[in-house]
Structure formats: structure tokens, C-alpha cells
A protein has these predicted regions:
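Post-HExxH zinc-binding segment in Zn-dependent metallohydrolases
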Residues: 103-140
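Sequence contexts marking disulfide-bonded cysteines in secreted/extracellular proteins
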Residues: 53-55, 104, 143-145
Length: 148
């Protein structure tokens, strides 16, 4: 079942890469698909470096730039729009590694804004609310720290 899910995910990733190419300046031609692993909530939180019991933060997906692997929560469902948007977000990070950014937060801002656009195009009027992201958390995630 998991192997079938991962094979079907490849088709979805190709469709999402086309969407990324049509909605951003990120390079999507001649792109290899990253490996995808379905992992437990505990492993996602460990890879992110926070306690699984940390209130309000539920990690659903991560991209590791070093090994080029997308990690998705083991209950990821290709038919769930929010889950597809998590995969889209991590595919954006996969493509961002080829570009220059001032800071990691700038990459997050681009990924979130594209994810929000994708959700709006699919009838989610308030993507931040659907993703359980409040304005303060969004600012923290997407604002580069001042460098002196």
C-alpha cells in the first residue's frame, strides 16, 4: 500500500511542478523528483528539532536540502487538499535550492505564498486559517532577522 501511494505521488509531484512553473519564476524543467518518505509524527518533530508535545506546532512535512528528501506525515493522503498543499510547499523548497535567497525566512515566505495561492485556487478562501497559521507565527516564519 505504501509503495503504491509513493508511486501515485510521483504523478502528483509532476502535476504540482507544472503548477509551480506556471505560478513562479522557479526552474522546473529538467528536474529530478525528490525521494519521498512517509514518517511518524515523532520523527518529523525530531527532524525539525522540536518536541512532539510542543503546543500548537504540528509538523506535517519537511524537506531536507542535504539529502533531497521530502518527509511527509505517515497519514498523508493524496485526496486531501491540505495534504497536497504540504507536498507542494516542500516541492517549492526542492526547487528553491537552485536559487539565491537572503535568508531561510525569505524561502518560507515564497513557499507559503504559493501554497496559499494553490489553496485559494482550490476554493479555500482563508488558507492561513485552514493551515492553522496565525499572523504572528507567519511573521516569525517569513521575516529575515536584521543583520548588523
Amino acid at each position: 500500500q505504501t509503495k503504491r501511494k509513493l508511486n501515485e505521488m510521483k504523478e502528483l509531484m509532476l502535476l504540482l511542478l507544472v503548477w509551480i512553473g506556471n505560478n513562479s519564476t522557479l526552474e522546473v524543467e529538467r528536474v529530478f523528483l525528490p525521494e519521498v518518505k512517509l514518517v511518524s509524527s515523532a520523527e518529523l518533530h525530531e527532524r525539525f528539532g522540536i518536541e512532539e508535545t510542543c503546543d500548537g506546532i504540528k509538523i506535517k512535512a519537511l524537506y531536507n536540502r542535504d539529502n533531497k528528501i521530502i518527509y511527509l506525515h505517515e497519514d498523508w493522503n493524496e485526496y486531501n487538499l491540505l495534504d497536497r498543499s504540504f507536498l507542494l510547499h516542500e516541492l517549492i523548497h526542492h526547487r528553491q535550492k537552485e536559487s539565491e535567497y537572503a535568508c531561510r525566512q525569505e524561502m518560507e515566505e515564497e513557499a507559503y505564498e504559493l501554497q496559499f495561492k494553490y489553496l485559494k485556487e482550490n476554493a479555500i478562501n482563508n488558507p492561513k486559517e485552514a493551515l492553522n497559521i496565525n499572523d504572528v507565527f507567519y511573521i516569525i516564519l517569513t521575516t529575515c532577522a536584521a543583520v548588523e
